[in-house]
Amino acid sequence: MKTKNLLLVLVVGAMALGCNSVNQTSAPLKTAADTASFYLGYLNGNGMAQMGMTDLNMNALVAGMNSALQKKEMKTDQRDMEMYLNNYFQKLSIMRAAANLEKGKKFLAENAKKAGVDTLSDGIQYKVIKAGEGPKPQETDIVKVNYKGTLLDGTEFDSSYKRGEPAEFPLNRVIPGWTKSLKEMPVGSTWEIYIPSDQAYGPRGGGPIGPNETLIFEVELLEIVSPEADKK
C-alpha cells in the first residue's frame, strides 16, 4: 500500500466513523482544540487498528507527529520514508493474511463438528435457523434479503438491519460464497453462513475485512424479485 493511499484511508475512515459514539478519555478536554485533537487521534487509531497496525510504538508515533507539526528538519527524506513504509506494510499484510488464513481453517474445522452445521461445495458451511418453503433462486436471479456480516471475532462490518431496509442484488454479482449458498436456500429461510476466505474477499480483503478473512453471515431470503423464469 502506498503511503499516500494509507493517509487517505485513515482520513476516509475517520470521516466514516465520525458519527459513531466514542468513549470519552479520562484526560480532561477543556477546549474545542482538545476535543478535536482527541477525536482525530481516536479515529485515526481506529483506522490503523482495522488495518492490523496494532504493534506500533506510540512514543515514536507521537514523536514523529510532533516533529512534523514543528517542521523539524529530518535526516531522512520523505521519499525514503515512504519506501520504508511501503515495504513495512507489505510485510505486515503478508503476515496478517497468513494468520487470518490459519485462523479461518481452524474455525471451520471445529465448526463443521457442531450440531446442525452442514457443508456445501468449496468448504462453505451453513446452519438453518429458520426453514423456508419457497422456491430456490437461480444464479441469474435478483434476490431481496436481510443480512448481517461479522468477522470471526464478532466484529460486525455490514448490516441491512441497521440501514433499515432489505438489500436487493443479482445473485451472480456478489462474492462466490453468497452465490453458492443462496442458490440452496428456499425463500423464507434464514441461515447462518460461514464463508471461507477464498469464497469471500480473498487475500486482498476490503474495508474492515482483512486479507484472507473467514466471514459469517446471517441471511434471511425474503423473495426472488426477478425470477429467471419470467425472462423466458
Feature map (PLM): residue ranges:
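Oxyanion-binding "anion nests"
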Residues: 10
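Glycine-rich, flexible loop motifs
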Residues: 13
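Cross-family detector of peptidyl-prolyl cis-trans isomerase
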Residues: 2-6, 19-232
